[in-house]
Amino acid sequence: MVKIGNVDIHGPLVLAPMAGVTDAPFRALCRAQGAALTCTEMVSAKALVYHDEKTKQLLWSPPDEHPAAAQIFGHEPEVMAEAAPMALEYSGADILDINMGCPVGKVIRSGDGSALMRDPELAGRVIEAVVKAVDAPVTVKFRKGWDGGNVNAVAFAQMCQQAGASAIAVHGRTRVQMYAGRADWDIIRDVKRAVTIPVIANGDIFSGADAAHILRYTGADLAMIGRGSFGDPWLFARGNAAIAGEPEPELPPLCERIEAALHQIEFAADIKGERLACLEARSQFCWYLRGVPHANTYKQEVVHVETLDELRRITHAIQRDLRD
């Protein structure tokens, strides 16, 4: 067990916050497969302060989702401090996470996300302001650095700890790398040796063996699975088994995986409405089609889906093909 502030994490694997991915239905799937901590999609602190209804909706969580974190992004200490309690209230989360790692251009241009790694003094003031504003533990997610010539993860981690963060998550790539190349697990190991708060290792966990290896190699307290979970929430079960030195469970049959994908979208429709859920299904459902015969044909149908009935028809057609 790992403690993040006063919150107990009963397992080694956590789900990364990912925009457009980690909504409540997907988090529920990952939790059912052994994710010990889940996190909302990142939301704009400024949008929360402006009481944007769509932003509030992104934070919606079922009452039984614990332990859980809510993630906000922004660079203005006063705005972040005002938004932090709101994020916890709307989500019911136990932990408040600050995004200082997002590499996306529109986020960077506003001075948010990993742009804060270029201004550690401001980043520290943001963390201090948020820590003072909430009773919950505050965590920070960041990267190796801005680029190859500006690798400052160790010093940044120490700053986070000094500013009051209860834990940190480190992605082993720079902002300039985005998601290209290999994640540098050495920098995560260096960070772990430099701080006393829990360290969460993130980057290139695509198998159960990867999950076990990153924890052994870096000495990190927890491992955070991101893109590896796309269409594969069962990765958490395999990772937990590998870490425990047990045989990894087999993937469920393709028919069951496709059914899980459909249930995910149906759950999303209950929360967001059918139209938005179907728009998101155009990418999310396709992740589950790996290994399906004629997958490209089905993908061409899915990317035009507008109703749940259409998606159900495609799902049943896939299942018929798999049984034949």
Residue ranges of predicted features:
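N-terminal small/glycine-rich loop or linker at the start of catalytic domains
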Residues: 2-14, 46-67, 102-112, 127, ...
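Hydrophobic faces of well-ordered beta-strands that scaffold small-molecule active sites
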Residues: 13-17, 38-40, 68-72, 96, ...
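Active-site beta-loop-alpha junctions enriched in small/polar residues
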Residues: 18-20, 43-45, 73-75, 101-103, ...
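Alpha/beta catalytic cores of nucleotide-metabolism and tRNA/nucleoside-modifying enzymes
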Residues: 1, 9, 13, 19, ...
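Hydrophobic alpha-helical membrane-association signature
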Residues: 119-122, 126, 260-261, 281
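Glycine-rich, positively charged N-terminal anion/phosphate-binding segment
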Residues: 1-3, 18-94
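Alpha/beta enzyme core
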Residues: 81-112, 120-197, 213
